[in-house]
Amino acid sequence: MFLLYEYDIFWAFLLISSVIPILAFLLSGILAPIRKDPEKLSSYESGIEPIGDAWLQFRIRYYMFALVFVVFDVETVFLYPWAMSFDVLGVSVFIEALIFVLILIVGLVYAWRKGALEWS
């Protein structure tokens, strides 16, 4: 039989972690002064007055490099729990993780061949 009371702490944590940001957002909207001064609308660059145009275009290679990084960073998030419980899960989960890693290696080779990892 599935017992829901075992998850009471989870639901309480989920509720509290959802309510706190919503309350903070609402309170900041209520308490913050609403002014449209030119100083408020100007861009802020680490305490230095902005020189020139603040909007710059980034080259697509930075985007591709960041995208490849995010993909392999998420891979680590998925593989860590598997590695921690490897001895309990058995051979079938090992084969599934191996297929997952092989798919990611194929993606890495594809990104490498397309030049997503090159800076020049």
Curated annotation (Swiss-Prot):
A Pfam family per the record: Oxidored_q4
InterPro entries registered for this protein in UniProt: NAD(P)H_OxRDtase_bac/plastid (IPR023043), NADH_UbQ/plastoQ_OxRdtase_su3 (IPR000440), NDAH_ubi_oxred_su3_sf (IPR038430)
Family: Belongs to the complex I subunit 3 family.
Subcellular localization: Plastid, Chloroplast thylakoid membrane
Topological category with respect to the lipid bilayer: Multi-pass membrane protein
Gene name of the record: ndhC
GO molecular function: NADH dehydrogenase (ubiquinone) activity; quinone binding
Its EC number(s): 7.1.1.-
Name the UniProt record assigns to this protein: NAD(P)H-quinone oxidoreductase subunit 3, chloroplastic
Function: NDH shuttles electrons from NAD(P)H:plastoquinone, via FMN and iron-sulfur (Fe-S) centers, to quinones in the photosynthetic chain and possibly in a chloroplast respiratory chain. The immediate electron acceptor for the enzyme in this species is believed to be plastoquinone. Couples the redox reaction to proton translocation, and thus conserves the redox energy in a proton gradient.
Subunit structure comment from the entry: NDH is composed of at least 16 different subunits, 5 of which are encoded in the nucleus.
Class of enzymatic activity (EC top level): translocase
Cellular component terms per the entry's GO annotation: chloroplast thylakoid membrane; NADH dehydrogenase complex
Major localization listed first in the record, in broad terms: plastid
PANTHER family: NADH-UBIQUINONE OXIDOREDUCTASE CHAIN 3
GO terms (BP aspect): photosynthesis, light reaction
Keywords associated with the record: Chloroplast, Membrane, NAD, NADP, Plastid, Plastoquinone, Quinone, Thylakoid, Translocase, Transmembrane, Transmembrane helix, Transport
Membrane-crossing segments per the record: 9-29, 64-84, 88-108
